[in-house]
Curated annotation (Swiss-Prot):
This is Very long chain fatty acid elongase 7. GO terms for cellular component: endoplasmic reticulum; endoplasmic reticulum membrane. InterPro entries: ELO_CS, ELO_fam, ELOVL7. Residues 49-72, 137-142, 198-206, 258-281 are cytoplasmic. The gene is Elovl7. Its main location: endoplasmic reticulum. Residues 2-27, 94-115, 163-176, 228-236 are lumenal. The modification N-acetylalanine is found at A2. A motif (Di-lysine motif) lies at residues 277-281. The chain crosses the membrane at residues 28-48, 73-93, 116-136, 143-162, 177-197, 207-227, 237-257. One of its GO terms (molecular function) is fatty acid elongase activity.
Length: 281
């Protein structure tokens, strides 16, 4: 009886909560409920932390050079497209970079922003292959808690962003992230091409700097919410989540920077059998 009552309460809570969702995305892929993505992400975590390593335990690592080159440069092109769309749907066509609220209209620009937000959300599922490639190549040391957490939490939280607040100042971090990913995955693409291209990877340290700048800009931009008394952004809870996430990764990357470049400890080699070792977000 108690379980039945709890279930009923949960269903009522969900119904009351979901009624405020954006109807424009109701019938889009993966957007009807959070359950499909939760199942996908659960299977991803199970595969990369348990099933995959067990299946590969007595097997040789897969040779995935061509697949990784194709994958990385595809992400570069996809990120260029998403960055352009974020600019054209708001960030370069009217947003103030201050209190930019969500436009829930059916206008072409508003719908372009919604579509771009969904593309960004979907791209996070494509990026799960980062970890799958690690597992298939038996690079299990790179499948860290932080890596898996990041690749799981990004699509899961972005579902709520697209469902309720596709646009406005909560998308600035996505604009920056797509721009950074253009550079990052270009770097990984060169890495995947083998040792012959190592001479073109002298700018690895600057890649870390770029990621640090990304988190600083995200934190500063979102931090404006505390100083804008009349900002009527519809879902401020999302801004607090973004700011918390930005601060956490800013601290993690500062620690990485200090350990790698200031304290004098040696970094892992940029290339190992033609493959990169690097943090990326």
């Amino acid at each position: 009886m108690a379980f039945s009552d709890l279930t009923s309460r949960t269903v009522r809570f969900y119904d009351n909560w979901i009624k405020d969702a954006d109807p424009r995305v109701e019938n889009w892929l993966l957007m009807s409920s959070p359950l499909p993505q939760t199942i996908i992400l659960g299977l991803y975590v199970y595969f990369v932390t348990s099933l995959g390593p067990k299946l590969m335990e007595n097997r040789k690592p897969f040779e995935l050079k061509k697949a990784m080159i194709t994958y990385n440069f595809f992400i570069v092109l996809f990120s260029v497209y998403m960055c352009y769309e974020f600019v054209m749907s708001g960030w370069g066509t009217g947003y103030s970079f201050r209190c930019d609220i969500v436009d829930y209209s059916q206008s072409p620009r508003a719908m372009r922003m919604v579509h771009t937000c969904w593309l960004y959300y979907f791209s996070k599922f494509i990026e799960l292959f980062d970890t799958i490639f690690f597992v298939l190549r038996k690079k299990n040391s790179q499948v860290t808690f932080l890596h898996v957490f990041h690749h799981t939490i990004m699509p899961w939280t972005w579902w709520f962003g697209v469902k309720f607040a596709a646009g406005g100042l909560g998308t600035f971090h996505a604009l920056l992230n797509t721009a950074v990913h253009v550079v990052m995955y270009f770097y990984y693409g060169l890495c995947a091409m083998g040792p012959a291209y190592q001479k073109y990877l002298w700018w690895k340290k600057h890649l870390t700097s770029l990621q640090l700048v990304q988190f600083v800009l995200v934190t500063v931009h979102i931090g404006q919410i505390f100083f804008m008394e009349d900002c009527n952004y519809q879902y401020p809870v999302f801004l607090y989540i973004i700011m918390s996430y930005g601060c956490i990764f800013l601290l993690l990357f500062l620690h990485f920077w200090y350990r790698a470049y200031t304290k004098g400890q040696r970094l892992p080699k940029t290339m190992e059998n033609g493959n990169c070792k690097s943090k990326h977000h």
